[in-house]
Amino acid sequence: DYCGPQRYTAVPDRLYRNRGDGTFVDVTAEAGVTSEYGPALGVVAADFNMDGWVDVYVANDGEPNQLWINQQDGRFENGALLAGVALNNNGSAEASMGLDAADFDADGDDDLFMTHITTETNTLYINNGFGLFDDRSARVGLGPTSLAYTGFGTGWIDIDNDGWLDLVIANGAVKTEEALLRANDPYPLHQRNQLYANLGNGRFEEASKRGGSVFERSEVSRGAAFGDVDNDGDIDVVMTNNNGPARLL
């Protein structure tokens, strides 16, 4: 088993401002981002409330998440609870790990997707255009099919080049009892990765079986990175695995 976040003391996140010359200065204290913190495993920056200023979202493992709203004067305030992204739809903090933001529904604002531990669904928060969010994980088809998995790396990418952003999730268990292991399974933490196809109507379907043999393989995946590795015009995926080789998709 891997040690959970309760074994460690959380420390405040840090914010570094780019000086514009390739160097950075620590502005954590003056920015006000030390007032609330948790065991953070994911971070993403975007203009969530559409005011022209970049905000910062932090995903915490087992504690409420933070949405640092840019106050336009160098300071940030945590607006996660008011915005509806501190907790899930049931009012519970989840084991947030993998995280990405994108305009998956093409309505002009960035939405949030994050992965969680086995028995917790992955979560999709849909932005209303003013920085308020609605947890629609179950309604869009991303809930029940994720319950058996522990997700780490994730990303929005258009896998099939149909103009709609799909989801790739790198999975791997952290506890043997969460791995739903079979009798005498020599690799109890291994899980298969997942691919969700965006249907273009606000809903998703799991398309892992159509994604090829890489989504049939079971490993202890912990991270994913995305880019056009071979310069052929489409997005490739690199997944890292504990006690195993990285995979290039």
Predicted features, each with a name:
Residues 1-249:
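Acidic, glycine/proline-rich Ca2+-coordinating loop motifs
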